[in-house]
Design a protein with these regions (language model features):
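Ligand-site clamp/hinge motif
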Residues: 174, 202-248, 374-375, 383-385, ...
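Extracytoplasmic/peripheral linker and loop segments enriched in polar/acidic and small residues
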Residues: 379, 383-394, 421-489
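Gly/Pro-rich hinge or "lid" segments in bacterial periplasmic/extracellular proteins
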Residues: 76, 155-156, 161-214, 222-225, ...
Length: 512
């Protein structure tokens, strides 16, 4: 199958089906025209924000709760429920709370709620995936009704980002997941399993009354059906939950509109540096030079991505542009393979220079991307065996180091501490996410120094140097950062996407 056929076949089939379905029956829109219907892919795993960290649980929590701190447009930590954050010494952080903030049941937010939230996360009997983020926390105490003191075991410059966490009321127990109560712009009404989550406007929200009466998060697992409901007007908006081909087609519908913004989701090819072939940096650089990212972004991703140079996105305050960028250059890739000792033994003949295998999930869109990468590598002499798996099987193999290459994505990269978690030599499994077994003492030194640095300026300088070394070493083959995109009816106003595509903007959205 030729490249143009591969890139066009999917959306032709999809939209032929939609054409057939447009006369069918759908859920009727809400009776209240000032309630927004938002399309999501699945139900939440858990509405207790200390436990539920899947995408839909997280987005629902953004509407019901507030974080102690939040992230601004440059992914810097800034106050949310906090009035301010002070750091009088390297081991102490003092949070002063805003006054007059009400929970949905009417009681005022105090330091007791904050202390309870964090102590519950540290409680060995409380099972939470967030627990590991607070290993450096020695104690948390309420100094008074509106002041909380966090004491650390050791200096940790990224600690403030760990305060970007929803605050629950003091005493929230096991049943809290069934009727969550927060301080956010919307209060929980109901959850119909695998159908919808209903939220009502909270008129006493400290950040100002929401511009709409409420939200219905409609659970529609299928991309085609979400696109269809948008076209029919039974859904008002979908954010980042439509395939690029569907977004492209919906963009030509006069009743719909697109809003795009830079995102922080990072797609990459992971590399096993214990593999004798891939230990050679020149081979990794050759792979990076052989991939035609621009063609994949233009044709498969429909322009909804930008070329990535590393795990930190350009919107991050710590991002450094002064790093090596591997642009599509097959000739350079062949030269690098020559230098690595993998010479072309038969000129333009069929014999490959070397064989590698790539593991990936069995999602059809990923298969299409892999087929292009496979062809790119073939042209420079690398025979790539693409193997697809159910996600659970793929992930288990990655955790065990059972791979040469794999492709996954990091979602919501927001803090430069990701460099430590993914590339520091002390973060190899089971301690962290250094699943490719990368080891560079200078990168370790720079990351350690950044963690202990007193100012963001020092941290940015140190992280910038680490990014330069990582780009050259290529322990990951960077592919792209996804672009955030919201598709909505033209009656919808006020859509403003953040880098992490939080649902918080929905409080300012109106429908006319």
């Amino acid at each position: 199958m030729s490249r143009p056929t591969i890139w066009s076949f999917g959306h032709l089939v999809i939209w032929s089906l939609i054409g057939l379905l447009t006369s069918g029956c759908l859920h009727r829109p809400t009776a209240n025209p000032n309630v927004l219907v938002v399309g999501v892919t699945s139900g939440p795993n858990n509405l207790d924000p200390r436990i539920g960290t899947d995408d839909v649980s997280g987005k629902t929590a953004q509407l019901i709760f507030n974080n102690l701190m939040t992230l601004d447009e440059r992914l810097r930590v800034s106050p949310d429920l906090a009035e301010r954050l002070d750091n009088p010494d390297p081991l102490t952080y003092v949070v002063t709370l805003k006054r007059g903030v009400s929970f949905h049941d009417g009681h005022e937010l105090t330091s007791a709620d904050v202390v309870y939230t964090f102590r519950s996360l540290l409680d060995p009997a409380f099972v939470s995936p967030r627990k590991g983020a607070f290993r450096m926390l020695n104690a948390i105490e309420a100094r008074d009704r509106y002041t909380v003191v966090f004491s650390l075991n050791e200096p940790f410059g990224s600690f403030p980002v760990n305060l970007v966490i929803p605050i629950v009321p003091d005493g929230a127990g096991p049943s809290f997941r069934d009727h969550p109560i927060g301080t956010g712009p919307y209060r929980f009404v109901s959850y119909a399993t695998d159908d919808r989550i209903e939220l009502a406007r909270f008129d006493d929200y400290f950040g100002g009354r929401p511009q709409n009466d409420g939200l219905i998060l409609r659970i529609v697992p299928d991309d085609i059906m979400r696109g269809l409901e948008l076209r029919k007007g039974t859904m008002d908006i979908v954010v980042n939950d439509l395939a690029p081909d569907i977004v492209y087609q919906l963009g030509h519908d006069p009743d719909l509109q697109l809003v795009k913004a830079p995102g922080v989701d990072y797609q990459y090819i992971g590399v096993n540096l214990r593999d004798p072939i891939l230990q050679n940096k020149l081979v990794r650089q050759a792979i990076a030079s052989a991939i035609d990212r621009d063609a994949i972004i233009e044709h498969l991703r429909r322009g909804l991505a930008i070329h990535a140079t590393g795990i930190l996105p350009p919107v991050s305050w710590a991002f450094s542009p002064a790093v090596a960028e591997f642009k599509y250059d097959p000739a350079r890739a062949r030269e690098l393979l020559d230098q690595a000792g993998y010479r072309d033994s038969d000129g333009d003949g069929p014999a490959p220079r070397l064989h590698l295998s790539l593991k990936m999930s069995n999602i059809e869109f990923n298969r299409l991307q892999a087929s292009v990468i496979q062809e790119n590598l073939r042209t420079v002499g690398i025979a790539l065996d693409v193997r697809t798996y159910e996600f659970a099987t793929l992930y288990a193999d990655v955790l065990k180091g059972n791979f040469q290459l794999f492709t996954l994505q990091w979602v919501g990269v927001s803090d430069p501490d990701m460099l430590r978690r993914v590339f520091h030599s002390k973060q190899m499994p089971p301690n962290g996410f250094n699943r490719g077994y990368y080891e560079n003492p200078e990168v370790d030194r720079l990351i350690d120094a950044a963690m202990a640095a007193a100012t963001d300026e020092d941290r940015r300088r140190l992280y910038g140097e680490a990014q330069r070394l990582l780009a050259e070493d290529a322990p990951y083959i960077s592919l792209w950062y996804k672009t955030n995109v919201a598709v909505s009816r033209t009656q919808i106003e006020g859509v403003k996407l953040t880098p992490s595509a939080e649902f918080t903007f929905l409080r300012d959205v109106t429908k006319h």
